[in-house]
């Protein structure tokens, strides 16, 4: 099939499949492969335009694949001011960002996709689609920035607000201006940028949309922002509970909340893994008539031939997961030091890809050296789950945020002890 053919399902995924391995990516790959009668388009949202290695071989029923960068390759702005009304643009952004206004979202979609002219006195010009630079590096963009800064965070550092605005609004307008594959249903695997793309596509293509959340996107982004050392709090509220001044960190959090509220309001179906997640979804506007639960599961027959290895030289604890901050691998390393005090010959295997966040991997290796755990902790890289499971006595999980981890279900097939810290 060609990219012009209509797919049955368009999967919209952010920062995940097929560039990143992990539980959600494996589930997505399985979901596509077990439905060979359906055709799938995949829109993989990435942070920037730099090429990435595809870690999964795309199934044969994938008819269209495209990567969508939030920050396209920078180009010199076109000559002439784009004929975008900065006041309308800024007010729409303010209402979308500050109040998750659905009408403002519609206005932004129109601005992103409506051909425009340019102010070129005495020179011929033609109407054309706006460039990404028109949305973040033009006179109308400057007007819109100032409207948002004054309304949303007047006390915050202006330079910090500028960069937050440029990053977040640039991402939003990339999503809203990107070409759309044709599909009967648009299925986002989170809220965030993926959720916005899915509900926009469904509206424009007169199709249906669904959102499936394993972890709750807004919670995970809030954790990322709280841990971020590139954000500096410049408004010191002390212990004041009712201080309503907003710092730039608050702007980031509010934008991600608005993404979710708009996506929930417009989606036809919202599914998640278990009931506790629905509490968070309801808090951001999801309705009971939209919501359902589909728990995680594994195919037990695939694990039937595995037998725990007996008489190993050392008792073995394993953590299976990506080496990224939200998995809190450093906490696993600290736990390994405690375990070694009780079981001196224990081996702790940290099993998973190390290339997603190289600086965090280096920090983890330094922590192993600091705690003198070189003979206890071993980073194995990615391994086949069926090969490693029989060697594990205990499965350890230290994630800050997890929904219903597949690795614990898989560990249960070997009757390995499972634990979370």
Where are the regions a protein language model picked out?
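Short acidic alpha-helix that forms the nucleotide-activated donor recognition element
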Residues: 261-265, 381-392, 413
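Carbohydrate-associated surface elements
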Residues: 276, 297
């Amino acid at each position: 099939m060609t990219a012009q053919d209509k797919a049955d399902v368009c999967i919209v995924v952010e920062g995940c499949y097929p560039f990143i391995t992990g539980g959600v990516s494996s589930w997505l790959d399985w979901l596509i492969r077990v439905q060979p009668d359906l055709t799938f388009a995949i829109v993989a949202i990435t942070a920037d335009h730099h090429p990435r290695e595809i870690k999964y071989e795309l199934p044969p029923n994938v008819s269209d694949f495209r990567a969508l960068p939030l920050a396209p390759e920078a180009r010199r702005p076109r000559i002439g001011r784009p004929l975008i009304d900065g006041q309308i643009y800024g007010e729409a952004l303010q209402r979308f960002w500050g109040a998750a206004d659905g009408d403002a979202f519609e206005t932004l979609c129109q601005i992103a996709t409506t051909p425009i002219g340019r102010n070129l006195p005495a020179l011929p010009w033609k109407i054309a689609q706006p460039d990404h630079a028109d949305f973040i590096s033009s006179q109308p963009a400057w007007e819109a920035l100032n409207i948002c800064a004054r309304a949303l965070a007047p006390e915050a550092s202006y330079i910090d607000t500028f960069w937050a605005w440029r990053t977040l609004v640039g991402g939003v307008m990339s999503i809203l201006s990107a070409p759309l594959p044709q599909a009967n249903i648009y299925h986002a695997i989170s809220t965030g940028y993926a959720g916005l793309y899915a509900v926009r596509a469904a509206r424009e293509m007169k199709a249906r949309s669904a959102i499936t959340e394993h972890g709750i996107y807004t919670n995970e982004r809030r954790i990322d922002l709280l841990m971020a050392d590139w954000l500096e709090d410049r408004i010191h509220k002390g212990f004041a509970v009712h201080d309503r001044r907003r710092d730039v960190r608050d702007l980031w959090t509010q934008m991600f909340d608005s993404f979710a509220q708009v996506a929930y309001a417009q989606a036809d179906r919202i599914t998640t893994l278990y009931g506790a997640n629905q509490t968070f979804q309801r808090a951001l506007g999801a309705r009971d008539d939209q919501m359902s639960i589909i728990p995680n599961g594994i195919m037990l027959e695939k694990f039937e031939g595995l037998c725990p290895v007996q008489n190993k030289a050392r008792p073995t604890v394993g953590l299976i997961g990506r080496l990224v901050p939200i998995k809190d691998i450093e906490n696993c390393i600290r736990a390994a030091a405690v375990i070694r005090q009780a079981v001196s010959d224990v081996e702790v295997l940290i099993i998973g890809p190390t290339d997603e966040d190289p600086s965090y991997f280096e920090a983890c290796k330094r922590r192993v050296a600091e705690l003198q755990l070189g003979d206890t902790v071993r980073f194995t890289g990615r391994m086949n789950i069926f090969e490693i499971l029989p060697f594990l006595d205990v499965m350890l999980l230290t994630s800050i945020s997890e929904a219903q981890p597949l690795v614990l279900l898989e560990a249960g097939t070997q009757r390995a002890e499972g634990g979370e810290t």
